[in-house]
């Protein structure tokens, strides 16, 4: 490993002289994620109750109106449509992943409820739900269930690196979280 070379006093003075009158460039391209709060240990009964409460919103009878053309996407009324575009482009990277492969519809609903509850509890605003291709049952039902939940702000078909058309990126409403503002 190379040793660091130190500049002589003369070189340092020359550098300061050349840099006089310059100003620091404002960083405007990378949006930093807000710091997540540390989560304390949660009792098992509370976790089960959160899961039941969150899955209460999912109904098989209600069919929300989703766009049938192109990739699967949804934006809750009152949420900026640009959020779905950011999901599509991969500007948000998911912090929690849920794999629904091999689950029944009832199990999948419970796991979705648990994921949303965990996201809100741990202040995670982007998650990835992998429903897979399979017999297209979960692939069709998952967006319908997510669109019914009041804490789901938006979702979009995941980019290739997160599963492509076999997965969804979901934006979850967290109380303190606001989308980062670009300057």
Curated annotation (Swiss-Prot):
<comment type="similarity">
    <text>Belongs to the SmrB family.</text>
</comment>
<feature type="domain" description="Smr">
    <location>
        <begin position="98"/>
        <end position="173"/>
    </location>
</feature>
<protein>
    <recommendedName>
        <fullName>Ribosome rescue factor SmrB</fullName>
        <ecNumber>3.1.-.-</ecNumber>
    </recommendedName>
</protein>
<keyword id="KW-0255">Endonuclease</keyword>
<dbReference type="GO" id="GO:0004521">
    <property type="term" value="F:RNA endonuclease activity"/>
</dbReference>
<comment type="function">
    <text>Acts as a ribosome collision sensor. Detects stalled/collided disomes (pairs of ribosomes where the leading ribosome is stalled and a second ribosome has collided with it) and endonucleolytically cleaves mRNA at the 5' boundary of the stalled ribosome. Stalled/collided disomes form a new interface (primarily via the 30S subunits) that binds SmrB. Cleaved mRNA becomes available for tmRNA ligation, leading to ribosomal subunit dissociation and rescue of stalled ribosomes.</text>
</comment>
<dbReference type="InterPro" id="IPR022990">
    <property type="entry name" value="SmrB-like"/>
</dbReference>
<dbReference type="InterPro" id="IPR002625">
    <property type="entry name" value="Smr_dom"/>
</dbReference>
<dbReference type="GO" id="GO:0072344">
    <property type="term" value="P:rescue of stalled ribosome"/>
</dbReference>
<keyword id="KW-0540">Nuclease</keyword>
<dbReference type="GO" id="GO:0019843">
    <property type="term" value="F:rRNA binding"/>
</dbReference>
<dbReference type="InterPro" id="IPR036063">
    <property type="entry name" value="Smr_dom_sf"/>
</dbReference>
<keyword id="KW-0378">Hydrolase</keyword>
<keyword id="KW-0694">RNA-binding</keyword>
<keyword id="KW-0699">rRNA-binding</keyword>
<comment type="subunit">
    <text>Associates with collided ribosomes, but not with correctly translating polysomes.</text>
</comment>
<dbReference type="Pfam" id="PF01713">
    <property type="entry name" value="Smr"/>
</dbReference>
């Amino acid at each position: 490993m190379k040793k660091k070379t130190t500049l002589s006093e003369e070189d340092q003075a020359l550098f300061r002289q050349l840099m006089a009158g310059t100003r620091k460039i404002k960083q405007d391209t990378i949006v930093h994620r807000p710091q997540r709060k540390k989560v304390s240990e949660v009792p098992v009964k509370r976790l089960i109750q959160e899961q039941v409460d969150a899955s209460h919103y999912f109904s098989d009878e209600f069919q929300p109106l989703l766009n049938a053309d192109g990739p699967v996407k949804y934006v809750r009324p009152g949420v900026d449509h640009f959020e779905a575009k950011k999901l599509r482009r991969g500007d948000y990277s998911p912090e929690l992943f849920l794999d629904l492969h091999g689950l029944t519809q009832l199990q999948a609903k419970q796991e979705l409820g648990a994921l949303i509850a965990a996201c809100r509890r741990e202040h995670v605003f982007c998650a990835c739900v992998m429903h897979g291709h399979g017999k297209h049952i979960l692939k069709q039902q998952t967006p319908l269930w997510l669109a019914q939940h009041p804490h789901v702000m938006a979702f979009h078909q995941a980019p290739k690196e997160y599963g492509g058309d076999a997965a969804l990126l979901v934006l979850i409403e967290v109380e303190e979280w606001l989308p980062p503002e670009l300057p």
